[in-house]
Structures are given as structure tokens and as C-alpha cells.
From Swiss-Prot:
Organism lineage: Bacteria, Pseudomonadati, Pseudomonadota, Alphaproteobacteria, Sphingomonadales
Keywords: Cytoplasm, RNA-binding
Regions annotated as coiled coil: none
Region described as Disordered: spans on this chain: 135-160
Location(s) in or outside the cell: Cytoplasm
Any one of the GO CC terms: cytosol
Annotated protein name in UniProt: SsrA-binding protein
Source domain of life: Bacteria
Family annotation (SUPFAM superfamilies): Small protein B (SmpB) (SSF74982)
UniProt biased composition (Basic and acidic residues): 138-160
Amino acid sequence: MARPRPATFDKVKTVAENRRARFDYFIEQTYEAGLVLTGTEVKSLRFGEGSIAEAYAEVKDEXVWLVNANIPEFSHGNRFNHEAKRPRKLLLHEREINKLHGAVAREGMTLVPLSVYFNGKGRAKVELALAKGKKTHDKRETIKERDWKREQSRILRDRG
């Protein structure tokens, strides 16, 4: 009889989120990619530090790289501490990389990180979105829809 899984395997800890990306882009498809990190970067992320607000991903040399993601230096790190905004390699299957490369090159799409998290096994992952940029009028429509939904819920709450 197999041992039951520990409760820690079911938990997902979100470290950084790019909430602005869902407003600025039409999200076509999402991918889960592994993140190649050094030891001090992992420790820094486990403390909840890190930002992907200005980050993006690019396909270069048959690999996908996360660029401009800020993982601050580990406070207790020594001389082997990492560089805060260095490009970090993302781990994807080859067919996924080829698909992303084709979409970015031909269709004018962008690769945007939506969140960085630790999965149930404790591995650092990035939720990567294949997205198309919104125009200003699209953003206005999104704001109107959001306000209308908020107003509807307010009306229903007051009524009931």
C-alpha cells in the first residue's frame, strides 16, 4: 500500500503576479514553464520577493528567456549572490517553443508572464501567456464592462 501524499504537495504558493497584463493584453493561450534559477534566487522568491510587472519573454537561440524580471538579491547571500534583473531561461517542450516562436514572428503576438509560483513539488514555475496588445478603445470597453458588472452586483446585493 502506498503512503498518502503529504499535504504540502497540494499547495501552490504564488510569489509574483502581473495583474496589469490581463488589462493590457488579450490573452490567447497560457503555458506553464519551468524557471532556471540559482540558489539565492530561489531563496529570495521563497521569501516572497520578486516582481514581473515589467517583464516579458522572448524566443532566442531555440530557447525562451524571461527578460527584465526583478528578483532582488538575497539579503543573507554572500559574494555568490545573483544579479537582480538578469535574463532567466524558461523550460518548455520543443514543440511549444516552436509554436511560440512562430506566433511571435508571424502574428505579432507577445509573450507575457502572468505569475510566478511554486507548484506542489516546490518547483518554481511561470505562467506564460501568448497575448495580443489591446488598443486604447479596447481598454475603455474593458473598464466599462468591469464597472457595469460591479454595478449589477451592487444592485442585486441591495435588492436581496
